[in-house]
């Protein structure tokens, strides 16, 4: 890679999917290659035809070291959205990658960020029964009361993460959300008294 770059190769050259070398290196966890490309001027926020960035790809592949490097790189948009309005946090939440969710939140990803339809990462995790992600999001202060404006996730027409979990028969996720709601109620948080 270094030799190609030394000979003048375009650091942000795209393939037929619109992916760059940085996206591919991130997806496969080649952190040293990612660092080299970034040091040579690769655009950390460049997206492919689906709007995914290197951070999306690394998060989807559960490549923690690559996500850490990308997430700390100067100028990175940790909340960049793809064509579906999904951030890397939405992607990790859907996949049930609890440790990745925690890392992305630590790197500054907005736990309340919404994709199309008003869905947060909590909605995505609840609807899919991604309980590891759900737990990490709840620990990170995700808003359990937020109601999506429209819901095309599975069988529900709209609602809170709890309503989506119940509609999609995600019993453990629903139990976790009911318990979180009860704890918030006991603290007075459901009435805005926090």
Regions found by a protein language model. Give the residues of each.
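Ankyrin repeat domain, specifically the short helix-to-loop turn at the C-terminus of the second helix
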Residues: 2-9, 35-42, 68-76, 102-110, ...
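Ankyrin repeat boundary/linker residues
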Residues: 15, 48, 82, 115, ...
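Ankyrin repeat A-helix N-terminal signature
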Residues: 24-30, 57-63, 91-97, 124-130, ...
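Conserved ankyrin/ankyrin-like repeat signature
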Residues: 32-33, 65-66, 99-100, 133, ...
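Eukaryotic tandem repeat interaction scaffolds
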Residues: 60, 73-116
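Ankyrin-repeat-protein effector appendages
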Residues: 107, 140, 149-150, 155-194
């Amino acid at each position: 890679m270094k030799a190609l770059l030394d000979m003048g190769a375009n650091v942000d050259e795209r393939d037929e999917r619109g992916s760059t070398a940085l996206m591919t290196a991130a997806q496969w966890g080649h952190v040293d290659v990612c660092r080299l490309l970034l040091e040579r001027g690769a655009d950390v926020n460049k997206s492919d035809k689906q709007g995914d960035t290197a951070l999306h790809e690394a998060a989807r592949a559960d490549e923690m070291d690559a996500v850490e490097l990308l997430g700390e790189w100067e100028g990175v948009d940790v909340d960049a959205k793809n064509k579906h309005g999904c951030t890397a946090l939405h992607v990790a939440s859907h996949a049930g990658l609890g440790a990745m969710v925690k890392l992305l939140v630590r790197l500054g990803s907005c736990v309340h960020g919404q994709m199309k339809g008003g869905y947060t990462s909590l909605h995505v995790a609840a609807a899919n029964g991604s309980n590891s992600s759900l737990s990490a999001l709840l620990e990170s202060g995700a808003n359990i009361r937020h109601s999506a404006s429209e819901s095309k996730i599975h069988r529900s027409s709209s609602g809170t993460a709890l309503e989506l979990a119940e509609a999609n028969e995600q019993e453990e996720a629903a139990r976790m959300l009911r318990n979180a709601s009860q704890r918030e109620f006991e603290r007075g948080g459901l009435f805005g008294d926090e």
